[in-house]
Amino acid sequence: MAKMQAKVQADERDDGLREKMISVNRVTKVVKGGRILGFAALTVVGDGDGRVGMGKGKAKEVPVAVQKAMEQARRNMFKVPLKNGTLQHEVHGKHGASTVLLAPAKDGTGVIAGGPMRAVFDVMGVQNVVAKSHGSTNPYNLVRATLDGLRKQSTPADIAAKRGKSVEEILG
């Protein structure tokens, strides 16, 4: 199975969503009569204000696979609570053999993250974050682990509601 890593491409459509293609892989299905070639695309979509979604698409042609992935990413979008262009608190995410550590950063730090994680933060609109990946560097697993970590975030209001206290008491 030949592997073809694509450059991360950005695109902004008329609906205001940011789209990034993370990878396109050439895949092969072996049948009795020979090989059937196809393509698998991995994309992320975000609104630049905390909403993000991931999609994957498979087809015989690259543009069709990318289009399917973009449509799936738009359907799978969810909201991430941000605080001044960064994360609320440090969080760990895991998927498969990939583990990621996501930490908030001060203004001026920028996005310190590798490959697929950087694409997720770019489409989300995060300006300052530090991210470190451990284990598998498979782009699909890294994106899923990053999204897992982002889903685990909680706001001070969420924590206050769980503890039965006011937000002022939590923030101290």
Swiss-Prot record:
Coiled coil: none
GO biological process, one term: translation
Pfam families: Ribosomal_S5, Ribosomal_S5_C
Keywords: Ribonucleoprotein, Ribosomal protein, RNA-binding, rRNA-binding
Gene3D superfamilies: 3.30.160.20, 3.30.230.10
GO CC field: small ribosomal subunit
Superkingdom per UniProt: Bacteria
GO MF entries: rRNA binding; structural constituent of ribosome
InterPro entries on file: Ribosomal_Su5_D2-typ_SF, Ribosomal_uS5, Ribosomal_uS5_bac-type, Ribosomal_uS5_C, Ribosomal_uS5_N, Ribosomal_uS5_N_CS, Ribsml_uS5_D2-typ_fold_subgr
Domain S5 DRBM per the UniProt entry, residue ranges: 17-80
General function of this protein: With S4 and S12 plays an important role in translational accuracy. Located at the back of the 30S subunit body where it stabilizes the conformation of the head with respect to the body.
Domain text: The N-terminal domain interacts with the head of the 30S subunit; the C-terminal domain interacts with the body and contacts protein S4. The interaction surface between S4 and S5 is involved in control of translational fidelity.
Family stated for the protein in its record: Belongs to the universal ribosomal protein uS5 family.
PANTHER family: MITOCHONDRIAL RIBOSOMAL PROTEIN S5 (PTHR48277:SF1)
Subunit structure: Part of the 30S ribosomal subunit. Contacts proteins S4 and S8.
Protein name (database record): Small ribosomal subunit protein uS5
Species of provenance: Burkholderia multivorans (strain ATCC 17616 / 249)
